[in-house]
Structure formats: structure tokens, C-alpha cells
Amino acid sequence: MSWQTYVDDHLCCEIDGQHLTSAAILGHDGRVWVQSPNFPQFKPEEIAGIIKDFDEPGHLAPTGLFLGGTKYMVIQGEPGVVIRGKKGTGGITIKKTGMPLILGIYDEPMTPGQCNLVVERLGDYLVEQGF
């Protein structure tokens, strides 16, 4: 299965009639493995900040999580494994696996719980597959 299939069929799939606005799979080095067409252009330092928060949970809490110039307020996740952010009616979920980061961005009417489910389910599957 190609990485594009994971984004198209597993991240951008429909859940209760809703779907993510954009999604991507990145290496821990910030390189894009695959992304949806509308995934925001991000800066290397934004990914570096995300990786640092996985290594040092709470690092992003004072400043917020930035991706593509958009600032998300960091909300409770799973230290070292999942980072969740909120901005207005939308947000972001990032799951760290052994090799890639799985990122999902949503907006209403999708809920944070639906985004978490989609992103974390794929991340758990990839961990089981050795990624």
C-alpha cells in the first residue's frame, strides 16, 4: 500500500459524514512522506518545535503549536505520543510513531474526538506494522 493511500483512504476518509480538512505523514526529520493537496506549507522550525514537545512534553504549552503559520493552543494529549491543538472551531492532532508523524487538521462540523480517532487509529496501526 502506498503512503498516499494512507492519507486518502485512512486519514481523509469519512467519519459520521465528516472528514479532516487536511492531513499529512511526515518523517521525524520534517520531510513530507505524503500530504493532502491542501495541507498547509510549514516551516522546518515548526516541525522542530513539535518534535521537541514529543521529547520534552509541555515545551509548546507556553507559546502554542504553530503549523503553516497558524497558532494552535496546546490541549491535553498523551505525553511523548500525541499532541492535540485547538484553534477556534477547529484543531489538530499529531501522533508520533517509531518513524513518521501522523498529522490531521479539522474544522467544524468534525469534532476533536473524530479527528483524534482517525489520526490515532492510523498511528496505532502503523506502530503495529513496525513503523
Curated annotation (Swiss-Prot):
It is found in: Cytoplasm, Cytoskeleton. Disulfide bonds: none annotated. This is Profilin-1. Belongs to the profilin family. PANTHER family: PROFILIN (PTHR11604), PROFILIN LP04 (PTHR11604:SF67). The keyword Cytoplasm applies. Keywords: Actin-binding, Cytoplasm, Cytoskeleton. One of its GO terms (cellular component) is cell cortex. Gene3D superfamilies: Dynein light chain 2a, cytoplasmic (3.30.450.30). The keyword Cytoplasm applies. The gene is PRO1. Pfam families: Profilin. Occurs in many kinds of cells as a complex with monomeric actin in a 1:1 ratio. Binds to actin and affects the structure of the cytoskeleton. At high concentrations, profilin prevents the polymerization of actin, whereas it enhances it at low concentrations. By binding to PIP2, it inhibits the formation of IP3 and DG.
